[in-house]
From Swiss-Prot:
Disulphide-bonded residues: C68-C222, C353-C370, C413-C417
Gene: rhaB
Entry EC no(s): 2.7.1.5
Active-site residue numbers: D237
Lineage: Bacteria, Pseudomonadati, Pseudomonadota, Gammaproteobacteria, Enterobacterales
GO biological process: glycerol metabolic process; rhamnose catabolic process
Annotated residues for binding of substrate: G83, H236, D237, T238, N296
Function of the molecule: Involved in the catabolism of L-rhamnose (6-deoxy-L-mannose). Catalyzes the transfer of the gamma-phosphate group from ATP to the 1-hydroxyl group of L-rhamnulose to yield L-rhamnulose 1-phosphate.
Protein name: Rhamnulokinase
NCBIfam families: PRK10640.1 (NF007925), rhamnulo_kin (TIGR02627)
One GO location term (cellular component): cytosol
Zinc-finger among keywords: no
Pathway: Carbohydrate degradation; L-rhamnose degradation; glycerone phosphate from L-rhamnose: step 2/3
Length: 489
């Protein structure tokens, strides 16, 4: 077969898309077309920040039906989403309650309990995963302690992409790359860790053994009656984004830039040394047995909240105003957990500047300048940490995802990090999703083969560092941990 048509459902924390890919195996050309886009936002339910999962499922099905109604024969479907959140099911496979978002405050104070009762080093030795207060391990502990009436009804717990695949196929699956984000998978066995799971109060019977990307979960029957395989890809959106990152060589780092920024490198081995623990480095699962050695950064979430609060719709105009302002007048640590979900992001940023005796950003452009400069400087700090961890410097940084369209931030990143930045592709998560589908269909050999396809079909933009820029001169002075606490607490 010359042409393949694959559908990727890519769900982010603020929006979702159903994308159609067309792959010409003879010429190795790959194109994407957006079929359906929809909003994903939090809602308050019984005092919790929850996801409107029924609305998301409705939009997923609508997008799939749109493809089928065009008369296109779909070869496969797959779903990727954000990590750590889950859906509870009873014995009949019906949902128990609504899925609570990782941004809900129910996990406040939970992680310190685990550090005392299990031990920080022991948790890291077992999982290799960074300490974030909203990891699934702490969410489940909060669930079992705060909502025992729900816990009593639970027979299964599915992570978000696995839940939607279940709704399409009727088959349950626990995909490995996303499972590792829970901080509950043992890094040596690739299975759920008995000690960590027991601490949460959740039953091991809620979970099946994690499966690696590339297996067919089951079939979705389209309105025309065709059975279409649903593939388990690297279902954590960052894992998919890394697959589509055209990394030039082992000296290339990546930055998946979106609501979250995730900076790291690929490795055939995990890094679980005391140094890695001290830096709060994570070793998330990737495709083909590779590890994604990385660190979470709050990312463009801060900007997204400011845009929403200030009702700003013309982002290019705001960026143009921001670029005209001097650099490094207002600096914050984007990874301070005060920015996870404040009532008023603008006020929180201003308070952080005020508390550190800095000028206070007032205009929208000043707020954006504060966010961009602070992110770029934090990127530089973390890239330095990662280079020290592996004992080799990086020569190139690949920025992928929606954030790579921000030319100002890309240049600030290049200047602050002091290395060449390659920006693109924008649709990295979707492309990585498609890549695993094409491998499952035996159209591609492996991840490296797919990256060649990406490089041949998608243009990258190069940013050369300017050592004389204001932000480059400021790098040595910037200490993101100086007066703030990290997400790891």
């Amino acid at each position: 077969m010359t042409f393949r048509h694959c559908v990727a459902v890519d769900l982010g924390a603020s929006s979702g898309r159903v994308m159609l890919a067309r792959y010409d195996s003879k010429h190795r050309t790959l194109t994407l077309r957006e079929i359906h886009r929809f909003v994903n936002c939090l809602q308050k339910t019984d005092g919790f920040d929850t996801w409107d999962i029924d609305s998301l499922e409705k939009d997923i099905r609508l997008g799939l039906k749109k493809v089928c109604n065009e008369g296109i024969l779909i070869d496969s479907i797959s779903i990727d989403t954000w990590g750590v959140d889950y859906v509870l099911l009873d014995k009949q496979g019906q949902r128990v309650g609504l899925p609570v978002s990782y941004r809900d405050n129910r996990t406040t104070g939970i992680m310190p309990q685990a550090l005392v009762q299990i031990g920080k080093s022991e948790i890291y030795r077992r999982s290799g995963i960074q300490f974030l207060p909203f990891n699934t391990i702490y969410q489940l502990h909060a669930l079992t302690k705060q909502q025992p009436e729900l816990t009593a009804q639970v027979a299964h717990a599915l992570l978000m992409p696995d839940y939607f695949s279940y709704r399409l196929t009727g088959e349950m699956n626990w995909e490995y790359t996303n499972a590792t984000t829970t901080q509950l998978v043992n890094i040596n066995t690739d299975d759920w860790d008995d000690t960590l799971l027991a601490w949460t109060g959740a039953k091991k019977s809620w979970f099946g053994r994690p499966s690696h990307p590339g297996n067919v979960i089951g079939d979705w029957i389209c309105p025309q009656g065709n059975r279409i395989p649903v593939v388990a890809v690297a279902s954590h959106d960052t894992a998919s984004a890394v697959i589509a990152s055209p990394l030039a060589n082992k000296h290339s780092a990546y930055l998946s830039s979106g609501t979250w920024s995730l900076m790291g490198f690929e490795s055939k081995k995990p890094y679980t040394t005391d140094e890695a623990l001290a830096a709060n480095i994570t070793n998330e699962g990737g495709a083909e047995g590779r590890y994604r050695v990385l660190k979470n950064i709050m990312g463009l979430w801060l900007l997204q909240r400011v845009l929403k609060e200030r009702r700003i719709t013309d982002l290019p105009a705001l960026i143009a105003q921001t670029e005209a302002l001097p650099a490094c007048r207002f600096l914050i640590n984007p990874n301070d957990d005060r920015f996870i979900n404040p009532d008023d992001m603008r006020a929180e940023i201003q308070a952080a500047c005020r508390e550190t005796d800095q000028p206070v950003p007032v205009s929208d452009a000043e707020l954006a300048r504060c966010i961009f400069d602070s992110l770029a400087l934090l990127y530089a700090d973390i890239l330095h940490e990662l280079a020290n961890l592996r004992g080799e410097k990086f020569t190139q940084l690949h920025i992928v995802g929606g954030g790579c369209q921000n030319a100002l931030l890309n240049q600030l990143c290049a200047d602050a990090c002091g290395i060449r930045v390659m920006a693109g592709p924008v649709e990295a998560s979707t492309l990585g999703n498609i890549g695993i589908q094409l491998m499952t269909l035996d159209e591609l050999n492996n991840v490296d083969d797919f990256r060649q396809v990406v490089s041949a079909n998608y243009d990258l933009t190069t940013y050369i560092p300017n050592p004389d820029s204001e932000i480059a001169r400021h790098v040595a002075q910037f200490q993101p941990k100086r007066q703030t606490k990290e997400l790891c607490a």
